[in-house]
């Protein structure tokens, strides 16, 4: 599965408040935990900067379909601007660069 960094920005304070009302409810009733880990998707971390109206997530997904399924409802309901970047782990950096360095000799 591929790692993705999601940078999410609320468009305004009104939508941020509405989204957090839903998030608090979903967190407390277990919906977030259920949707954060499936066979093809896993939320590894989610951090909040509410003063900036921003949430940053690191997730692992089988494909862009799982990214869409997880994040699209939040975007559709609250107009959250989302940017997704495929990223790699430290071990991947080491492995990939070892291969690269072999070709540069």
Which positions does each model-derived feature cover?
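Short S/T/G/P-rich N-terminal loop/turn motif that feeds into the first structured element of a domain
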Residues: 1-53, 62-69, 88-105
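Conserved short beta-strand edge segments in small beta-sheet-based binding/regulatory domains
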Residues: 78-89
